């Protein structure tokens, strides 16, 4: 029997800032052993990237009204509502600058409602600290074990 490689999809919106740094750190943490990791900006991602993955991570900065980025990320996420998610393991990450971290809690609740199994979440403020990177790598590892 051929063991299928585990697949992890990391999908995020970032304008080259903190969210991208965290996405890359999660990717690094997940890139161990026989794991195929794909990191994509949401503009290049498809629903298949979520469906075909064994575990996923989504990232977005906090925008107005404690919401995720609404031109690309929000419609992408909303499209997942109709899918049979079957408790797929998920990590959420984002940056909130001066805003509070309510947006990620709100997002987590929505993803639970969609059927995801939330393994963890990570928010960074103005700049990415060393401990954020360590935590992000750890979340990446978690995704491979789920």
Task: Identify the residue ranges that each predicted region occupies.
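FMN-binding flavodoxin-like domain, especially the glycine-rich phosphate-binding loop
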Residues: 6-8, 18-21, 25-45, 49-146
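Aromatic-flanked redox-active Cys/Sec active sites in thiol-based oxidoreductases
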Residues: 12-16
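Short, Lys/Arg-enriched N-terminal segments with co-localized hydrophobic residues
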Residues: 1-4
């Amino acid at each position: 029997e051929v063991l299928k490689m585990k697949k992890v999809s990391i999908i995020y919106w970032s304008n080259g800032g903190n969210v991208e740094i965290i996405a890359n750190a999660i990717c690094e943490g997940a890139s161990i052993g026989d794991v195929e990791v794909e990191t994509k900006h949401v503009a290049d991602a498809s629903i298949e990237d979520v469906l075909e993955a064994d575990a996923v991570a989504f990232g977005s900065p906090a925008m107005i009204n404690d919401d995720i980025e609404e031109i690309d990320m929000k419609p992408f996420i909303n499209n997942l509502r109709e899918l049979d998610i079957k408790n797929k393991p998920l990590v959420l990450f984002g940056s909130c600058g001066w805003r509070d971290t309510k947006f990620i809690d709100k997002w987590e609740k929505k993803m639970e409602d969609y059927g995801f199994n939330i393994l963890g979440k990570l928010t960074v403020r103005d700049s990415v600290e060393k401990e954020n990177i360590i935590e992000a790598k750890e979340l990446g590892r978690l995704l491979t074990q789920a």
